Amino acid sequence: MENVDIFNKRREKLENIRERGKLEKNEYSISVHVWLLEEDKLWIQQRSNEKKIFPGLWEQSGGGVISGETSLEAVKRETKEELGLDIQDEEITYIGSYTRVTDIVDIWLVQRIFSKDKIILQDEEVANIKNVTFEEFDKMIENKEVVPTINPSYNLLKEYIEKIV
C-alpha cells in the first residue's frame, strides 16, 4: 500500500503521512482524474474485473498522488502505469478540483493524438480502452456503464471544453 501526504480541506499540507485509505476525520489525500481528448473524442478505460470497487465499469485515467509527489507528477505516472503513455507537460492542462469525502480530486486534460497500438494496458487496473464522443459517453452514463462517482469530474471537463470551443 502506498503512503500519501495528508491535507486539510483548504489543501494545506499537514505533517502527517499515512497509508492510503487510513485517513482520519478532516484529513484528505489528493487524487487525479486524467481525461484524454483526441480532437472531439475521449479515450476512456474499462476497470479490470479484478478491481474490488466498480469492476468492469468505464472511467477516465487517474489515481492517487503518492507522498512527495505533485498532482502533475501523478498525472504522468498514472498514465504511464495504466496505459503506457509518456505525457509531456505541454500536453497537460489543469481544469479544476473538487472535494469528496476523503480526497481532493484534481481534474486534468491531456490533448493529443493517441495511437491505440501504442497503448499498453496495466492488466490489474485496466481491461480495455476505447475512443468515444461526448454523446456516446453521456449515453454510457445513462446506461450505468460508467463509474457512478464520475459526474463532478466529467461536468468540470464539459464546462472547460465549452469555454474553449
Identify the role of each PLM range:
Residues 6, 36, 44, 109-110, ...:
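Conserved hydrophobic "DFG−1" position in protein kinase catalytic cores
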Residues 1-33:
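Acidic, metal-coordinating catalytic segment for phosphate/diphosphate chemistry
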